[in-house]
């Protein structure tokens, strides 16, 4: 990952808060767009989607400022580590809490999502292995290689 010149400052905390807020807004607006479209409100859906794209770009600004965008290998490793934390810790902890509070259906959902996150981690690690094995050469499908004259 890149260098984070804000490490350990209030500004770093603010950047993470801004990134989280913009990321959450993007997802909410995407969900809202689906509801509006299903109800026949095409213009409202389009506005939600346009705003969601704006929020994505805002989030990217803060993510880049935090030094979190690396090269493909770094991004794959970062993604794999995040997925690992989700399936080994976060969702298991949440499932246990839900069970203790009597929300067994939700606990099962947490564990189901954890299983998917495990597959995500495995996929990212396999891709990382492939990228590292290729070195600095990007993958080009055979059809693209043949057309390079």
Model-inferred region functions:
Residues 1-149:
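Non-heme di-metal
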